């Protein structure tokens, strides 16, 4: 689509068709760049030398004499999408490697698991405590700058930690440095994770959100599958400081990729200016607006409520399944590792089928069906004792969970206006991460009282009840839509 001058050009064969309708979109400025309708010749040639190179999205519809319609659109080309995916790859390489390496460093330094728990809380608590105001801030900021500065902070934090580790400071100094860096980066990750979902809307059309989200999740799951294997080999031969510096370099590369993108992501609502008290009042007001917006948009609220309840009911399943495999089925650590590798591949497989599901069915249909399939295979997991059957059931469970994550994100991007997307995303993250803690407590109590098998069986019954509630809620919502129309 790009000519020698770097501007957008397009040629499409139209043999067998009589009329054509063609649109070119400028995603940088959110405008329709060009539009044509006419009779087909041998091909359509768009003369767009005056257009910006940022014009990279198009849709063409061809009409035949017999009424047959052909529709085609462009998703990924050389340019912003590929550069963004480079940023995602480097970001996930750094995050996955640090997620694997940091616990090993802490255990080697202290020999105590309590420090791991504290560090884990530093990674999740910022979402609970700061998610809502940070989401409001993101909605008033240039999201590209938020992403690049977040990557810069992570680079600086891990580079500092690498220096401390390389200097072979005493354990106390090193542990304090790990605490401080983890806390700062935990807060930074709130900004980054909220911004990246909003940022996609600036250069990807709504019809392609699902594709981009599935690719991003595919990269994440692939990194989560491969990096521990590489990290395990590297940790024994590469110094801690150098490994940490490699992680830091990944975030520097991610920031550089974002800077190379030709995307305008201007501030919403004028940014945050003026005295600190006024800015705080603005953030509080914006947060309230986000909550009010979510309450009035039930089509956005229902998925949050259903997903939150689902997380409470299934939050402890991974722990229960591990106990069942080790204690009830007497699997060796090698067998458990094999099963976990298969389940990770299930999560990756989910990223490949989610686009087909999104194209073929409504969101609520996929959501409800997902609950039902997960219920069935969680119950089947309890029924089997063979390692291959256990691996197969958990493969499907993780596949469904992957699909669930992507469809919820895509649905939110499709339904929420860009000016509210940061706030709504932060509400989703704060709620869903918060209820995970409740899920661990609730599921752990059931497991401790009745045993892990019975806890999983009971969660299956609860998921069935939740599914019925979801069917009723969406039936009522669809009835109201029909009445309004």
Regions found by a protein language model. Give the residues of each.
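Transmembrane alpha-helix termini and helix-breaking/packing motifs in multi-pass membrane transporters
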Residues: 103-109, 162-169, 226-246, 327-328, ...
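Juxtamembrane intracellular "pre-TM" segments in multi-pass secondary transporters
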Residues: 76-81, 264-304
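MFS-fold secondary transporters
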Residues: 107, 160-169, 185, 257-258, ...
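C-terminal transmembrane bundle of multi-pass solute transporters/carriers
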Residues: 129, 140, 146, 150, ...
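Short amphipathic helix-loop junctions that connect adjacent transmembrane helices
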Residues: 101-114, 319-334
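Helix-loop junctions at membrane interfaces in 12-TM secondary transporters
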Residues: 163-181, 382-394
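Helix-loop junctions on the cytosolic side of multi-pass membrane transporters
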Residues: 198, 202, 244, 248-276, ...
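Substrate-agnostic recognition of the 12-TM MFS/MFS-like secondary transporter fold
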Residues: 83-100, 120-138, 142-156, 177-235, ...
